[in-house]
């Protein structure tokens, strides 16, 4: 059974109190620290959020990503192997030369694992945003040219390929860390539910394709949730809390940077505010104080 997070933290605090009252305390009374491993793709790595972790520039891993925020606020011992562009297959195989499979960081002593994964399988995010952005520019923002051209193709790939890949990856993760609490985060909203005035300049998606793109993300999050629940993982749902913080919103409100005229070198990804909010909502979902 996964170790209850609150129990681990309470035990840690109790150990500290007892050690103060005992002379010659042995190592058995040492403070217990949460062993935390962060896995996943660029939404977990915080790609585009400065400063960048200099230990592995290929992964564009930020030192201000949500796993670092969680670790700083809880005092957990963090091993962060998140990597921009990661797919589910990179849990079990190297993504780049010198970058080990992400599951290598997990052991049977791991207490907590967090991750986002699936958006890069089939290149879903980049292909959908690029295709709809190009179609939007050519149409001057009118109609639904992306939906008209691609139909259910993105959804078909998500269902046929992404869902089973995520489920299999989570099963391997649980096998490696049978005592860990595993939290799988959904992706915060990229687009609003419908087209908004003034957004086309920042996110050039045709008005009829805004709900189409949102629907693709809804489906992706749904299969992530299904895979999480079917493997005994905790799904952290961002559908409600991230509503109204999409890439169309102004700086200071949006959690996701737009395709154009944003403040990040990596567009259509969480900014620093988004990473902090992802950390806070994940901590709430897990009962981390």
Locate the predicted segments by residue.
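Secretory targeting and sorting signals
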Residues: 1-30
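Structural recognition of the beta-strand scaffold that forms the well-ordered cores
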Residues: 35-40, 44, 77-82, 111-116, ...
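Oxyanion-hole/transition-state-stabilizing segment in secreted/luminal serine hydrolases
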Residues: 47, 96-158, 189
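Conserved N-terminal glycine/acidic-rich loop preference
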Residues: 112-115, 138-174, 183, 187-235
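Catalytic His-Asp segment of secreted/periplasmic serine-dependent ester chemistry enzymes
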Residues: 188-289
């Amino acid at each position: 059974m996964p170790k209850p997070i609150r129990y681990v933290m309470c035990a840690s605090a109790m150990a500290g109190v007892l050690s103060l009252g005992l002379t010659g305390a042995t190592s058995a009374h040492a403070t217990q620290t949460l062993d935390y491993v962060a896995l996943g793709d660029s939404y977990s790595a915080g790609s585009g959020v400065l400063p960048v972790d200099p230990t592995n520039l290929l992964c564009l891993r930020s030192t201000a990503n949500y796993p670092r925020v969680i670790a700083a606020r809880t005092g957990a011992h963090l091993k962060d192997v998140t990597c921009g562009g990661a797919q589910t297959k990179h849990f079990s195989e190297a993504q780049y030369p010198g970058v080990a499979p992400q599951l290598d960081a997990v052991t049977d002593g791991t207490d907590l694992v967090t991750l986002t994964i699936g958006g890069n399988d089939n290149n879903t995010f980049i292909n959908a945003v690029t295709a709809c952005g190009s179609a939007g520019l050519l149409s001057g923002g009118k109609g639904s040219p992306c939906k008209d051209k691609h139909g259910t193709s993105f959804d078909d790939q998500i269902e046929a390929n992404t869902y089973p890949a995520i489920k299999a990856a989570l099963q391997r993760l649980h096998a490696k860390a049978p005592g860990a609490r595993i939290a799988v985060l959904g992706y915060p909203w990229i687009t609003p539910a419908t087209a908004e005035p003034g957004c086309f300049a920042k996110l050039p998606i045709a008005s009829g394709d805004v709900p189409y793109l949102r629907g693709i993300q809804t489906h992706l999050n749904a299969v992530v949730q299904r895979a999480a629940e079917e493997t005994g993982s905790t799904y952290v749902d961002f559908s409600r809390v991230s509503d109204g913080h999409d890439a169309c919103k102004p700086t200071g409100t949006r959690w996701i940077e737009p395709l154009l005229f944003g403040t990040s070198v990596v567009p259509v990804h969480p900014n620093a505010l988004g990473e902090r909010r992802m950390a806070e909502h994940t901590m709430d979902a897990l009962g981390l104080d």
